[in-house]
């Protein structure tokens, strides 16, 4: 139980018959998601057919829009040895980051055999892709992939449909009762756990057989669930960027080398932090435009 256990006792169709309905509607409003409709409706039907048999069925439907996760500040891991990482604003010109609600920027050069950008440059020079004379001019910066915003990996639409059917039988028309109960649920939402999960086409069913009277009860349950098309959004972003990481880092370093040549040709200083920051920005832009899979495209 993630948030505790809730005990519920439903109405018995022998005692509570008829039809009841409910409906709720409203609007959820937020800066990022705007105004969105919310609907929650349901119906319950129950009937006592005889002193021995009664049945009930209920159906409910909910539809709304999840809150958007748009805090893109950066994790600061400097204090990890003392405890949890803190959250800071990303710095201008930063080349390696791990931002909140952006997935895939965990893929970094520091986790590859190259180690840093100069390591990639050395490899490209060894296979004749860039001039060897440029390698010492590459900074030893760690570079991370450009991640995907959470809103690019999910649609934030939430809905659920639930069905509950119960058959009640009293063989001796006394307090001994045999109950068969079936529950079915399907839905889409976002689940927050260790990571953020996009729950898509989730389906769950539970079946119960119960024998009871005023002095005892015996229950047997069967529960089955299918995650459908659900996925961990953090690892979805990571795996998308891992799939073509070598190509992206190579393209990045190649674009940086092109920029270095232009700076040297114009008499500039390639070790100037402002120049390096611009070279990094141009290299990232080119690598993203050339290699990174774009949300909304067929390849993505």
Regions found by a protein language model. Give the residues of each.
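Flexible loop and strand-edge segments within Gram-negative outer membrane beta-barrel domains
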Residues: 64-68, 177-212, 216-263, 269, ...
């Amino acid at each position: 139980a993630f948030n505790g256990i809730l005990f519920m006792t439903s109405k018995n169709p022998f005692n509570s018959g008829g039809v009841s309905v409910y409906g709720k509607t409203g609007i959820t409003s937020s800066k990022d998601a705007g105004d969105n409709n919310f609907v929650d409706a349901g119906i319950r039907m129950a009937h006592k057919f005889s002193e021995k048999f009664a049945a009930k069925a209920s159906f409910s439907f909910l539809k709304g829009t999840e809150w958007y996760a748009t805090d893109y500040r950066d994790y600061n891991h400097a204090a990890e040895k003392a405890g949890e990482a803190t959250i800071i604003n990303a710095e201008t010109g930063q080349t390696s980051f791990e931002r909140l609600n952006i997935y895939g920027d965990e893929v970094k050069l520091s986790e590859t055999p190259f180690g840093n950008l100069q390591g990639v440059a050395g490899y490209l020079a060894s296979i004749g892709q860039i001039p060897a004379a440029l390698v010492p001019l590459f900074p030893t910066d760690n570079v991370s992939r450009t991640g995907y915003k959470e809103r690019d990996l999910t649609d934030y639409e939430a809905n659920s449909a639930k069905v509950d059917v119960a058959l009640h039988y009293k063989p001796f028309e006394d307090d001994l009762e045999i109950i068969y109960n079936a529950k079915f649920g399907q839905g889409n939402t976002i689940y927050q756990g260790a990571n953020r999960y996009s729950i898509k086409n989730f389906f769950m069913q539970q079946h119960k057989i119960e024998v009871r009277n005023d002095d005892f009860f015996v229950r047997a349950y069967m529960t089955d669930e299918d995650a459908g098309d659900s996925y961990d959004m953090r690892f979805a972003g990571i795996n998308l960027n891992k799939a073509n990481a070598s190509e992206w880092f190579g393209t990045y370093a190649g674009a940086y080398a092109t920029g270095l040549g232009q700076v040297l040709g114009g008499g500039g200083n390639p070790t100037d932090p402002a120049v390096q920051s611009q070279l990094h920005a141009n290299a990232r832009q080119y690598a993203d435009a050339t290699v990174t899979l774009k949300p909304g495209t067929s390849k993505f």
